[in-house]
């Protein structure tokens, strides 16, 4: 199975990575085209486009300006160690064993507005470019049009090479919209995580994001390779609810925290 997750806005380029091994992103030529578009934007443009403060806009102007395609461990960092945020808190990549890291390199892919699709150990330079950004480019008015079939084709190439029957979609709607499910050659499974609040089970964003990361960790550490094994996920008190689930959307519930 191949797992898809979203990136994170929060980045860590200060602390050393959890391992020395690294790989290179497959779609860097595409990234370079986007960087060239982003370099035409002023801080005011970025603040408006990304709905961020002037300080963050200025930071991103500097990031786009200093971005260079020749990645090395000195000027870039492996994606799974660079991203911070709720999903990555749940995954806790810094404590993955070498075996689980290598499994992640094969099984996990990170969707990205700038890089398209990243393997966990792919080097990346700091950026902020969310997939939903309406960045006009040569291919259209937004990043979905820019990426077109490219990300989907890359996923299909990977699943064909590895013989993956299932794609476990643990990405947000914003990012999974960059994938064209009808063109995929594997069955898409989208786990749903609900927490009990005021007597009702609801998707609570903070908890759901963290749960996605915990499920990635569960898959890697427990060598999960079937849906039967996947629904045994029980980290942090979650449990599979058969009556609330469908074939493609297994639902996991948790009592009030």
Curated annotation (Swiss-Prot):
It holds the Pfam family H2O2_YaaD. It comes from the Bacteria. PANTHER family: PEROXIDE STRESS RESISTANCE PROTEIN YAAA, PEROXIDE STRESS RESPONSE PROTEIN YAAA. This is UPF0246 protein Shal_1126. Belongs to the UPF0246 family. GO terms for biological process: response to hydroperoxide. GO terms for cellular component: cytosol. InterPro entries: YaaA (IPR005583).
